[in-house]
Amino acid sequence: MFSDPDEIPNPEKIKDFNLVCKYGIFLQNKYTYKLNLFNKYESPWEGTRICKKKDLKSIDWLRHSTLMKNLKYSFWRVDKEKNIQIINNGGWHFNYLLNPSEISKKFKSLAETSWDKEEFYNEENIKK
């Protein structure tokens, strides 16, 4: 099992990995900036990966080649791994957990102009 430090797999779901499948992807709820700020736009997050040791080619290969979109490719795309189990409700991914002043600084530095409004980087609003 491989996971980034900010990805926490649901321990209840680890036992759901079917050993007939080579690989598993835990679909995780994503939280951004605060522990209770659910990010519905990037959830579910393709987070933690799991496989048997004999099927592990490399950690990088596991992260970059076992993707949910592979399941949509036709059977003749033998270059795409398709023996993947999707594990729903697979845990939590926490992104950019920062204090209010750091969140404000991050919003001010974003290139995206839609976030360039006082309401988004005002520290008092962030504290709410």
Spans of model-derived segments:
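Conserved catalytic core of nucleotide-sugar-dependent glycosyltransferases
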Residues: 7-121
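Charged phosphate-binding loop/patch that engages nucleotide di/tri-phosphates or the phosphate backbone
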Residues: 121-128
